[in-house]
Design a protein with these regions (language model features):
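Long, well-ordered amphipathic alpha-helical subdomains in the mid-to-C-terminal portions
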Residues: 15-20
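Short, small-residue-biased leader/transition segments that mark boundaries at the very start
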Residues: 1-7
Length: 77
């Protein structure tokens, strides 16, 4: 449903933003890299709609891992 898609995107955006801000504070990416990381996570992750708290935690972990891999690969700087 549209509502579950909104929740999923909020989870991904929050986790991606937190991971990107942490990388920025560690001087691994630029300030503008935060926005790029969030956009990439929102457009690049295909996750099922969360149906439980464990689904929410899984989506959060997946988004953080996705952003970390973007940074480690040099796609976001």
């Amino acid at each position: 449903s549209a509502a579950s898609d909104v929740y999923k995107r909020q989870i991904v955006l929050n986790a991606a933003n937190e991971a990107a801000v942490a990388a920025f504070l560690d001087r691994k990416i630029s300030f503008l890299g935060i926005g790029r990381a969030c956009r990439e996570a929102l457009s690049g992750l295909v996750l099922p709609a969360p149906k439980s708290l464990s689904d929410i935690y899984a989506a959060d972990r997946e988004a953080r891992s996705f952003v970390d891999s973007l940074i480690c690969s040099g796609r976001i700087s």
